[in-house]
Amino acid sequence: MDKKRSKKSTLTQQQRNNKRQRANAQQLDVLRHEYRLCATPDAATRRRISALIDMTERSVQIWFQNTRAKQKKAMRGRESREDDFDDGLADVSVDDVSVDDVSMTADVINSPVDVIHHRTDVSSSADMLHHFGADLVTTPIQTHFNHLLATPPTSSSSSHVTTVDSPASSITDFSTLGHMTPNLTPTTPHHVTLPPIFFPTLSLTIGNWRRLSPQLSLAYYPSTDTMLYHMTSEKTQFRMQFPFSAIEEIHVSRNPNDTLGALNLTLNCSPSFSIQTPKAPGRWVGCHDFSEGKQASNVTTHVCNGPATVLQQQLSRVFALRSNHVNGHVSRRRLADVIGSSDIIGSADVMGTVAVDTSNHMISSHVGDFELSVTSHCEPSHMIEPTPTPTPVANHHHHRSADSVAHVTNPSGHVTNHNHLSDPAANLTSTILGNVTPGHTTPVLDDGFELGHVTDINDLVSVAQLLPNHVTEAELASNCHMIANNAFTLDPSTPLSPFSGTLDYLEYY
């Protein structure tokens, strides 16, 4: 005993720092999300992750190494069992692969969660739904949970039965998934199936009904333009989905004293619901609202808690995909013309905006110090009357163009006004405006995200065209950490990163 104690005392501080640190459930959510983005992070990325989740860099490195090893082992096991599968199931799509399947460790299974075990035998779908709705108000049931779904959601109503018939994928090396850059050229789901974008959701609250991780996931499916919640209770799986066009408002709010934040959604219609029972694996059957008191059908506001920075980045990726899908064919000249049209920046209250014509709805997203507004080209009878814009100061002489889209945002009232577009060609335009707020830090996409992967639009626009009227170009250039040639890069596919190069942040004092 004395020898052991003596040996332990000879450890250096560096050796003690290198000891493995057990991750809690909250840290694991962030680690899994980062693993989906990149399975082999470099030293800078590991340092960023360790600072974000308060773990040592060595512990982060070990977690990634172990996860890659488990994934390769699972892949070898899958290959050895391929002969046992029917020919129709031999090809596996990207959506069939779960990082959580191969990375789930005792850290999650033994995480401190109050568990209520239910041993009730449920003989019918109706009984399961009743049992599920009542159970969700308490605490989640401790089960092994697969965050990624076997099939992407369908865009049609869930009143019918769906089976596992997702398109086959040619990807067999799952270790490369973290390095994949989605093909963002305009296409249809029949040509390519993009992987879903997952939001690290620790809890979901709708009215008084609450669901907790790890029996919960939220993802955006680009192929169907659908948001989908996936939940489990014992061996029964539940889905709640709605089209992205059903979202009236979506924004990320954060506590300045905490790393956690909330993704807030407001819907204009109730979601559709489906269930998959153990007796019919792979078959999703439409069902009634399984939430307690059917609150998911009656309450339109959803609150999803999770790491604020990651929620913010994932929301920007969703906007990027949708923006590029709609506006991929817009010419550089059209974008430059719209940027140059000048009442877009009209007063000190105007935040940087992203204006994208998509479907017939309006989405406004507060993300960090940015406000992203996605508005549709509505008929005149549905248009909001524009409010008068204050006259700009002498430093910025701008004149309204006939085809400009004016976005005036009142941060307190959260209202976005726009004028009717007289030029139909301007309907499919994207304007990316840099927002510079005194005394604030504007986060952008992580430093591993290269703009060249997602767009070939690299026109540089004068800083003077993008500034609020109370800031001069000289003030910005002298007070910012980094601006490429005093210019911003037009990049409609990355709403949160309209700057040249790969930046961690841009500060203005």
UniProtKB/Swiss-Prot annotation:
Keyword DNA-binding appears in the UniProt entry: yes
Annotation: DNA-binding region: 16-75
Region (Disordered): 1-26
Family annotation (InterPro entries): HD, Homeobox_CS, Homeobox_DNA-bind_prot, Homeodomain-like_sf
PANTHER family per the UniProt record, alphabetical: HEMATOPOIETICALLY-EXPRESSED HOMEOBOX PROTEIN HHEX, HOMEOBOX PROTEIN HHEX
Main location: nucleus
Organism (species): Yarrowia lipolytica (strain CLIB 122 / E 150)
Listed GO MF terms: DNA-binding transcription factor activity, RNA polymerase II-specific; RNA polymerase II cis-regulatory region sequence-specific DNA binding
Compartments (UniProt record): Nucleus
A Pfam family hit: Homeodomain
Keywords recorded for this protein, A-Z: DNA-binding, Homeobox, Nucleus
Protein name from the UniProt record: Homeobox protein HOY1
CC per GO annotation: nucleus
Organism domain of life: Eukaryota
GO biological process, one term: regulation of transcription by RNA polymerase II
Presence of keyword DNA-binding: yes
